Amino acid sequence: MPSRSSVAQWAALLIGLPLLALALVVLADAIPDRFVLYRLRDAIEAGQLDDPSYSVGYAGGQVDGYSECKRMTVGVGVPPGTNTLESAVRSFTLGPCETAVPAVLDWADGNELTGSYQYFQYWNGSAVLLRPTVAAVGVAGTRILAAIALAAAAIALLWRVARAVGGVSAGLLGAPLLLTTDFIDLPGALVQAIGMVVTLAGAALLLWFVRGSAGPSTCAAAAFAC
């Protein structure tokens, strides 16, 4: 039977984590819109964001910008009178690139933002990362950081696999992942890049936690998570 202390710890975890997640969204939403909009305008003028939501990547595959524009503009164009907490929960957005790009350009011309709509989800975790990062380093800088994070997560996973079951197994896992997928194009689709970083880093973390007993079956489970 679980002790009272363990029950209390789990209860605190179950209550505390959602509150922490909400607090992070509120903090991201509190960043003034103009810091994000100036960066988006610069990216549009530099050709880093276009009206079409889908483009062709370096590897020749289709790059999904649809979700990217929606997530980068979460919290932008909030209706007047909406407080920060309500805005964070309801997650207003300018939408996909077809609507977000013209809206940003209209704002740059001195017009008011219109056309935002509610993009409610359980938790817009990508907005927690994208909104402050875009405001700080711009879209191009965010893509560079995404590429670095992807490389680091992939290296961490392959290193843990090599330590557990050998370099051949790590190669058999890494080669298909890196050479036969659109991995190289992921920084051009930031939402998918974040998801891949979490997946790879999570699998590497799993192998680190069980490093004393990691065998082929454990590595297979970690690979399946990818």
Name each model-derived stretch.
Residues 1-30, 217:
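Start-transfer (signal-anchor) and selected internal transmembrane alpha helices
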Residues 116-123, 129:
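Extended, hydrophilic extramembrane loops/domains of integral membrane proteins
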